């Protein structure tokens, strides 16, 4: 606040999962995507504390003259409903997803693995690695078993580059970049699915170590 600059927060992994109060946090702009809280893809929201920001698309008077073009009302309504349902069940969903996350970590205790994170983390995403096991191979084997994980964030989906987040945190030469997988959880996952993942990981690693 000592500088004449606006403070923007990409809250895509927080909205619908945590209680977010932009005014209390001193946030000027906050953005989120509907699909992250189970709303329609291709629609998002922008919170602004400073309504006098310039418009990017010119032509029409839609959205208070800030973004010209016809509004996608069906998607906007779907996003609003999805956000309402997510916030209404915020605490219950958080506790349930946390139980799934803890179930995974407990189920993998007898395996050699490491957790990429700090002490402060959300339960919705686990980033774990298995020493000596290529994440590309693990990704393929899990996919063949009908289990979807990734080696990076959704922002880098489709690329062959290692996770830029892990590279920034551990260094570009870290073995973690080639060993780590990203597991995303939601309130729609079940304990049966988690148990299937745990069993499948044990089976795959047993086979790989046996090669």
Model regions and ranges:
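Pyridoxal 5′-phosphate
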Residues: 1-211
């Amino acid at each position: 606040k000592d500088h004449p600059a606006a403070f923007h927060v990409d809250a895509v992994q927080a909205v619908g999962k945590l209680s977010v109060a932009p005014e209390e946090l001193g946030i000027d702009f906050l953005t989120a995507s509907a699909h992250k809280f189970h709303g329609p893809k291709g629609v998002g929201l922008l919170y602004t504390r400073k309504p006098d920001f310039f418009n990017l698309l010119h032509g029409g008077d839609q959205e208070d003259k800030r973004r010209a073009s016809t509004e996608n009302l069906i998607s906007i309504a779907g996003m609003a409903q999805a956000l309402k349902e997510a916030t209404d069940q915020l605490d219950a969903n958080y506790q349930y997803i946390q139980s799934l996350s803890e179930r995974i970590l407990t189920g993998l205790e007898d395996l050699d693995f490491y957790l990429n994170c700090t002490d402060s983390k959300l339960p919705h995403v686990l980033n774990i690695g298995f020493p000596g096991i290529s994440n590309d191979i693990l990704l393929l084997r899990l996919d063949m078993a009908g289990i979807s994980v990734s080696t990076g964030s959704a922002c880098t989906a489709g690329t062959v580059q290692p996770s830029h987040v892990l590279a920034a945190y551990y260094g570009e030469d870290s073995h973690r970049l080639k060993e780590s997988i990203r597991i995303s959880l939601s309130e729609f996952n079940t304990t049966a699915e988690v148990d299937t993942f745990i069993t499948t990981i044990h089976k795959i690693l047993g086979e790989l170590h046996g090669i």
